[in-house]
């Protein structure tokens, strides 16, 4: 029951969940708001968060392997754990940096809603899945008029013979073609 458990749980469950949420927000932001988030701030946010997460949790793995127990608020009573005081200070500094990186994300999010570069195309990522066939800022029911018919698997990436590496789900299959 050491710091290894804390580090491993948070790097696997916590960090992966947050990166999934951030990826979804960056990906669907143009569809939700009709604008793009700032790319430069997005890259800074990603690299600070990525590096910071590992600067927090890899030293905790090391402390856990060295036998440092979790759920203790003060390690000064044990001489063997005093060697980790500077490492714990380093972890705290890394956590503060990661916190400020999240503030950068929040600023990027809200500023981009009003001042982000306008998304002028319906499908900026060239994604074949159905949600990108709706207009930007879709109204009630998502699609104006008739609901589109799905003919393909949502991730059917392949050359359509015209230089496109994707074919939307709504494109009918050609004769002899199969959806994978």
Language model regions located:
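Juxtamembrane/interfacial segments around transmembrane helices
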Residues: 19-29, 58, 97-106, 140-154
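Divalent metal-coordination and catalytic microenvironments
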Residues: 10, 51, 61, 106
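Juxtamembrane membrane-water interface segments of multi-pass membrane proteins
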Residues: 1-5, 20-46, 59-84, 107-127, ...
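A broad, low-specificity signal marking well-ordered, structured residues that form hydrophobic/aromatic
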Residues: 49, 104, 130
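Hydrophobic alpha-helical transmembrane segments
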Residues: 8-18, 83-101
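Hydrophobic membrane-spanning alpha-helices of multi-pass integral membrane proteins
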Residues: 14-19, 46-57
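Extramembrane terminal tails and long inter-domain/linker segments of multi-pass membrane proteins
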Residues: 66-83, 112-180
């Amino acid at each position: 029951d050491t710091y290894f458990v804390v580090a491993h749980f948070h790097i696997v469950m916590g960090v992966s969940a947050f990166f999934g949420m951030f990826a979804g927000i960056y990906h669907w932001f143009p569809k939700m708001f009709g604008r793009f988030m700032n790319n430069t701030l997005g890259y800074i946010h990603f690299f600070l968060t990525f590096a910071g997460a590992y600067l927090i949790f890899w030293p905790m793995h090391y402390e856990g392997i060295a036998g440092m127990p979790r759920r203790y608020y003060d390690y000064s009573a044990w001489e063997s754990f005093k060697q980790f005081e500077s490492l714990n200070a380093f972890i705290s500094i890394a956590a503060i940096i990661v916190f400020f990186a999240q503030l950068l994300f929040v600023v990027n999010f809200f500023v981009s809603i009003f001042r982000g570069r306008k998304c002028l195309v319906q499908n900026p990522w060239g994604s074949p899945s159905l949600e990108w066939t709706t207009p930007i800022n879709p109204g009630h029911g998502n699609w104006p008029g008739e609901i589109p018919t799905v003919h393909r698997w949502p991730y059917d990436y392949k050359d359509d013979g015209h230089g496109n590496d994707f074919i939307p789900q709504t494109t009918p299959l050609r004769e002899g073609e199969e959806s994978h």
